[in-house]
Swiss-Prot record:
Protein name stated in the entry: Imidazoleglycerol-phosphate dehydratase
Catalytic activity: D-erythro-1-(imidazol-4-yl)glycerol 3-phosphate = 3-(imidazol-4-yl)-2-oxopropyl phosphate + H2O
PANTHER family attached to this UniProt entry: IMIDAZOLEGLYCEROL-PHOSPHATE DEHYDRATASE (PTHR23133:SF2), IMIDAZOLEGLYCEROL-PHOSPHATE DEHYDRATASE HIS7 (PTHR23133)
Source organism of the structure: Rhodopseudomonas palustris (strain ATCC BAA-98 / CGA009)
Family statement: Belongs to the imidazoleglycerol-phosphate dehydratase family.
Keywords, alphabetical: Amino-acid biosynthesis, Cytoplasm, Histidine biosynthesis, Lyase
Pathway(s): Amino-acid biosynthesis; L-histidine biosynthesis; L-histidine from 5-phospho-alpha-D-ribose 1-diphosphate: step 6/9
Tagged with keyword Lyase: yes
Entry GO MF terms: imidazoleglycerol-phosphate dehydratase activity
Pfam families on file: IGPD
First-tier enzyme category under EC: lyase
Any one cellular-component term (Gene Ontology): cytoplasm
UniProt KW Cytoplasm keyword: yes
Lineage: Bacteria, Pseudomonadati, Pseudomonadota, Alphaproteobacteria, Hyphomicrobiales
């Protein structure tokens, strides 16, 4: 069973995240941030990873701490659920359209955390959600999941569509990269014999 639960509590947030990499895409996101919950629901649905997120944060300050800390906890949960990464496909490339928007997401589930994020949002906010927090979430997720992640919106005009294409692109890339490759016969997909360094 490739599952994990992470609990993270600070003075700013109290978060519990559970993932099942071999799930069916069931989502249960409750962060108190409507748009963010929508993105997490998309992530679960299109990755086919079951994701439960319960978060209580200092939303009276702003959405930054909750968004970033959910990224941290979700990344840690994915990393823990992957274990030694034996048998995974490891790499994936996705082009994700959303109406006028097209985003490219490339992932290497390598144990080597890195993020390249290139997306220009026409607006500062989507509803009450600061668009700069999209990058903050991806940074927190990539660093804590231990993945190399390149996210680039090639073009787009609507901020909601841009954010959605980024999350859906990650979802489909994760779905492919963490899938078990029957040709590897359970081997770690690296000439080093291990991933993570």
């Amino acid at each position: 069973m490739r599952t994990a639960t992470i609990k993270r509590k600070t003075k700013e947030t109290d978060i519990e995240v559970t993932v099942d990499l071999d799930g069916t895409g069931v989502a249960n996101a409750a962060t108190g941030i409507g748009f963010f919950d929508h993105m997490l629901d998309l992530l679960a649905k299109h990755s086919r990873i079951d994701i439960t997120v319960k978060a209580v944060g200092d939303l009276h300050v702003d959405f930054h701490h909750t968004t970033e800390d959910v990224g941290i906890a979700l990344g840690q949960a994915v990393k823990q659920a992957l274990g030694n990464m034996a048998g995974i496909t490891r790499y994936a490339t996705v082009l994700m359209p959303m109406d006028e928007t097209l985003t490219r997401v490339v992932i290497d589930v390598s144990g080597r955390p890195f993020l390249v994020f290139k997306a220009d949002f026409p607006r500062d906010k989507i509803g009450e959600f600061d668009t700069e927090l999209v990058r903050e979430w991806f940074q927190a997720f990539a660093m804590n999941a231990g993945v190399t992640l390149h996210v680039e919106t090639l073009y787009g005009e609507n901020s909601h569509h841009i954010a959605e294409s980024c999350f859906k692109g990650l979802a489909r890339a994760l779905r492919a990269a963490v899938a078990i490759d029957p040709k590897t016969a359970g081997e770690v997909p690296s000439t080093k014999g291990q991933l993570g360094g």
